[in-house]
């Protein structure tokens, strides 16, 4: 993921105005969730996953890449074998310690474009989560909160029998209604906006590569 971002002139990206967060540059990435969604949602034609990164983050990653600190292959240092990326991991602060000083909000959502009742329809469903509010509740920032709460709800669906059938399944193969209702109840309320601003999935720095 990192190496595809640091060479930003080659990236597929767009700038989007996120509710309560503001305008951010977001980059097209691969994510493992796409694999099962494409398989399990009937009729889906295209799925794209975007994530935002600040310029400071990208600059730091580019510098680290330039000096070899993002390498995952072992090198010899004073007769000992070390992996640069593992060394960097040890030098960075424990992510759990960042909660008290992480401020701002996350905006996580999906834009759906399709046909309903013979007509084109577009909706944007999303959640906004505050880092400091999350820390007050569970002593963790919003990134961990928005990861842990959905997993908890999924477990609850299984334990209570709301999701129950033999075999192994991904979340999108189960009844979404009780899950979505539980998100509202357990700290991740969501909103729906009709006809949102669309995302240009193919915008690049190269004007010759551009498709709406």
Question: What are the roles of these predicted feature ranges?
Answer:
Residues 22, 29-46:
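A conserved active-site cap/scaffold subdomain adjacent to cofactor or substrate pockets
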Residues 1-7, 12:
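Single conserved hydrophobic/aromatic residue that forms the stacking wall/gate
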Residues 15-16, 157:
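Short, flexible, solvent-exposed loop/turn segments with mixed acidic/basic and small polar residues
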Residues 36, 57, 70-212:
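C-terminal helical cap and adjacent loop that interface with cofactors, partners, or active-site loops
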Residues 2-3, 21, 138-139:
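Short coil/turn segments at secondary-structure junctions
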Residues 44-52, 60-79:
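Oxyanion-binding "anion nests"
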Residues 16-23:
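Flexible glycine/proline-enriched surface loops and loop-helix/loop-strand junctions
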Residues 23-27, 141-144:
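Hydrophobic alpha-helical scaffolding
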